[in-house]
């Protein structure tokens, strides 16, 4: 193995050693969401024609799990290394900033997709959701995990203590996730909130992902693809720049 592959393997091993916490726990949480929201809101929330609310909810929960866990992987790894003071050992290696980025974001994609697959496997029994366009599912799943993995890397570099990381997650990631259409179609919202939703990049990730299941979406999947791709490019550029300049990692 070369340098980036070793770091990638280390990051995979890091979350896999506590797999019950990092993989199984989010799956259990998604089951609870499905049981509670699917039961309470079935028939009460307007979604797509001929699509039950429980079936509509499933892709949203899968993508929400992918995004949140991809972010948690890179952000928690970096903040733990900074707080414990062992990040210096990585800095002593000849790894380039690109190798760091690929390893951290790549491992975040693996964790996000693993959790998403687990949520899909378990919750699919609640509603036999079709797979109209599997390629769209894979594309948006991968891009969403990479985007949040990159965002987690930026947050991990910025935060200097766990409180700052918790604030970033509680005031940025969680609100944007819950207001992205996981539990509802934006067409059920008043016009003003529909317009606000279009400024949320998480909405396009979830809407494009959901298109792969039903073949219908609130906006064109091609528009979602372009916007998510643009957001991924911006986040990647910022993350690479911060790593290259040693932002908050070099004394």
What do the predicted segments below correspond to?
Residues 1-135, 139-251:
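Hydrophobic transmembrane alpha-helices and immediately adjacent juxtamembrane helices
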């Amino acid at each position: 193995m070369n340098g980036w592959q070793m770091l990638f393997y280390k990051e995979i091993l890091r979350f896999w050693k506590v797999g019950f916490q990092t993989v199984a726990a989010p799956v259990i949480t998604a089951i609870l969401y499905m049981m509670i929201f699917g039961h309470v809101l079935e028939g009460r929330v307007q979604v797509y024609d001929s699509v039950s609310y429980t079936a509509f909810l499933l892709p949203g929960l899968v993508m929400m799990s992918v995004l949140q866990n991809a972010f948690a992987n890179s952000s928690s790894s970096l903040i733990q290394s900074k707080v414990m003071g062992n990040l210096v050992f990585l800095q002593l290696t000849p790894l380039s900033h690109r190798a760091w980025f690929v390893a951290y974001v790549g491992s975040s994609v693996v964790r996000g997709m693993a959790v998403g697959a687990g949520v899909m496997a378990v919750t699919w029994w609640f509603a036999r959701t079709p797979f109209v366009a599997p390629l769209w599912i894979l594309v948006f799943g991968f891009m969403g995990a990479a985007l949040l993995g990159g965002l987690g890397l930026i947050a991990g570099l910025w935060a200097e203590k766990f409180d700052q990381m918790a604030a970033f997650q509680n005031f940025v990631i969680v609100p944007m996730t819950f207001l992205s259409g996981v539990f509802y179609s934006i067409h059920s919202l008043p016009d003003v909130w529909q317009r606000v939703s279009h400024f949320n990049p998480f909405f396009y990730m979830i809407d494009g992902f959901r298109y792969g299941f039903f073949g219908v979406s609130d906006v064109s999947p091609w528009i979602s693809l372009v916007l998510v791709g643009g957001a991924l490019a911006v986040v990647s550029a910022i993350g690479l720049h911060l790593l290259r300049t040693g932002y908050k990692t070099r004394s």
